[in-house]
């Protein structure tokens, strides 16, 4: 899969072309942990074509941060409009392949032991966590903090602002910046 990705991604110049090459498309989707969305090709194409600065664009209406990460990494559309990104850049290729293997490792471990998967997920995401709403957007991260901070699972039924307040009372997220 990696060989096909590296060999053919450079020939792709649009979201439509990416989706047409199922092997490359699948590799990219798995790299961004969007395997469960692989068959939503229309949604993915529209998301990749979305204007990242237009508040009502599809990209900005999607709440799952994985879509934004993929959109930014591929760069088919920027604030300047549609682009033809350089998908042969070695840094881009290495970033996507590293993401792919990290994600496969996390998912395989999660399938065998959910606790290990949760810890690996936390390790993968913790440096990018800026606020409690980012934690609450991820079921795994929410679960991790509930267990780590001895908070009841039932708190997930509360209003998001109340959940945020409970978490903030127990732990200062700024402590994650200095492990």
Q: What do these predicted regions represent?
A:
Residues 1-23, 27-179:
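General marker for long, soluble alpha-helical cores
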